[in-house]
């Protein structure tokens, strides 16, 4: 089953940061699509097992961005 979640973040400001984060998340097994909106601070991810929301949020955090709840 494919899930889609939008994660709100802060700190993503450049196209290079978007490219790096997109590559990092896309390399996760189970991730199908990543869309990042700099203006709204949204990272929308389509994924299935073994990827999960917690592991995706951890990748964003490990890349240096904050998750906003």
Task: Label every PLM stretch briefly.
Residues 22-37:
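Short acidic amphipathic segments
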Residues 20-25, 55-63:
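Short amphipathic alpha-helices in soluble, non-transmembrane regions
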Residues 41-46:
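A generic structural motif
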């Amino acid at each position: 089953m494919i899930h889609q979640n939008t994660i709100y973040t802060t700190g993503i400001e450049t196209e290079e940061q978007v490219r790096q984060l997109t590559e990092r998340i896309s390399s996760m097994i189970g991730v199908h699509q990543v869309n990042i909106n700099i203006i709204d601070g949204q990272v929308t991810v389509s994924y299935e097992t073994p990827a999960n929301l917690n592991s995706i949020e951890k990748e964003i955090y490990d890349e240096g961005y904050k998750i906003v709840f």
